Design a protein with these regions (language model features):
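Active-site metal-coordination/substrate-binding segment of hydrolases
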Residues: 58, 80-148, 154, 165-166
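Predominant activation on well-ordered alpha-helical scaffold segments within soluble catalytic domains
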Residues: 21, 53, 124-131, 160, ...
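Short proline/glycine- and acidic-rich turn/helix-capping motifs at secondary-structure junctions
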Residues: 245-254, 367-380
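Redox- and metal-dependent alpha/beta enzyme cores, enriched for Fe-S-associated oxidoreductases
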Residues: 348-365
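Glycine/charged-rich beta-loop-alpha catalytic/anionic-binding loops adjacent to active sites
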Residues: 102-115, 249-259, 394
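Midchain, well-structured core segments that form catalytic/ion-binding scaffolds
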Residues: 153, 159-343
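N-terminal helical capping/dimerization or prosegment-like subdomains
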Residues: 1-85, 90-93, 335-337
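Active-site-adjacent substrate-binding region
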Residues: 227-243, 375-394
């Protein structure tokens, strides 16, 4: 049977890659701010889901569009199925690509494009595994269901309507982790805080989504562009990381960092932190605006949450991480969003209490905190053992 499967997969490799290219070419960043009827996460995500379901229907599968929140592809009995759950939304593409992020290019055994790994390849893989089972008429004692989500990168709002409308699968596999089997997942702590911006800071903006180290941040200070540039240069904040230009309200300063997923913030460089650091050390603001900048600098520093009292580490999932991914100005206030991934050894409620206390001590008002519990399955669990055995045999 394994030889038949290998032969089928080899015969369909190019077709599979072409489907992956089609999926990757869709800019499916989850955008609830662009919601429309049937497209709660924006038009590009709606198009992404339609492409997947259309392809699945061409293979002869039963498909369902969950009103734009999710999609399902079913083989056999859906009420007694093993599920694959994958997501078709992506983190914003950021900069520094060697190829266009939504014009996928194959070089040898690699496909370059946003989402080619996380997680559209999982959608394609699961779809072709189901197609292989169907076309080879492989015997199964259960159904198989592919569940496609569209909001994994922004809080999993897609799974709320799914869980309300659909019967849970007998067991569900998540092809979005490391080889061979992930048996643990960190808990989460997501937070929004705010602080008054003061009169000398006309605006402060940074980042695109909560779960990415922000590659760019900008602000407007009420001095001339010449004064701002001179102060920054004297303090060692130089181009190309910092740019200064004139603005109607004063000087616009842009900081350029390096994007990285919130799961590994140590690989990035926060432009929000860079900008706050420059404003503080160059002496470009004072009074309430200086207090705001100092609070932002405190909040956005580091990668592991030590300053917020939430540092924790375990041998299975490693260190708790913290990313301040977004800064926005709303009226007279600056709002900051934090995405924390909590070690499985951490107590989420306790971490949230510590986090809130540290934020208030820094002069920040806490708007909200939300937590999810970690997941941990013993390595001796039969499901883990079965998956490891299958993966190593294949």
């Amino acid at each position: 049977m394994l030889e038949k499967c290998r032969a089928w997969l080899d015969a369909h490799e190019n077709e599979m890659i072409e489907d992956l290219k089609s999926f990757v070419s869709c800019c499916s960043v989850s955008r609830a701010d662009l919601a429309a009827p049937g497209a709660p996460f924006g038009p590009e995500n709606a198009e992404m889901l339609n492409r997947i379901l259309w392809r699945a229907a061409r293979f002869g599968f039963e498909t369902k569009n969950g009103n734009g929140y999710y999609g399902t592809v079913t083989l056999g009995k859906g009420d007694d199925a093993i599920g694959f759950i994958a997501h078709a939304d992506v983190v914003p593409e950021g900069n520094h690509w060697i190829h266009e992020p939504y014009n996928p290019v194959r070089e040898g055994d690699f496909l370059f494009g946003r989402g080619s790994s996380d997680n559209k390849s999982a959608c394609v893989s699961a779809l072709y595994i189901m197609r292989m089972i169907k076309e080879l008429n492989l015997p199964l004692r259960h159904g198989v269901k592919l569940i496609v989500g569209l909001s994994e990168e922004t809080g999993m709002q897609d799974m709320v309507p799914y869980n309300l409308a659909e019967k849970p699968c007998r067991v569900t596999l998540v092809p979005d982790g490391r080889f061979p089997v992930c048996y643990a997942q960190k808990g989460t702590l997501r937070a929004r805080v705010k602080i008054a911006r003061g009169e000398e800071l006309a605006g402060f903006e940074g980042g695109e989504v909560d779960n990415m180290v922000p590659p760019q941040a900008e602000c407007v200070v009420r001095v001339s562009a010449e004064e701002a540039k001179a102060a920054l240069t004297a303090s060692g904040f130089l181009a190309p990381e910092y740019e200064v230009s004139s603005d109607d309200a004063g000087a616009k300063i842009v900081a350029h960092g390096v994007a990285s997923h919130a799961a590994a913030p140590e690989h990035g460089k926060s432009a929000i932190l860079m900008l706050a650091d420059a404003l503080e050390k160059a002496g470009l603001v004072g009074g309430a605006s200086l207090r705001a900048v100092q609070a932002i600098h405190f909040f956005a520093q580091g990668c592991y949450g030590e300053h917020m009292g939430i540092a924790c580490e375990d041998p299975d999932t490693g260190k708790t991480t913290m990313t301040v991914g977004v800064a926005r100005t709303y009226g007279d206030e600056i709002e900051l969003h934090a995405d924390c991934r909590l070690s499985v050894a951490a107590n989420p409620a306790q971490m949230a209490a510590r986090f809130e206390e540290a934020a208030r001590n820094a002069g920040l008002d806490v708007i909200e905190t939300k937590t999810t519990d970690p997941v941990f399955i013993e390595k001796t669990d039969p499901r883990v053992q079965a998956l490891q055995k299958a993966y190593f045999e294949m």
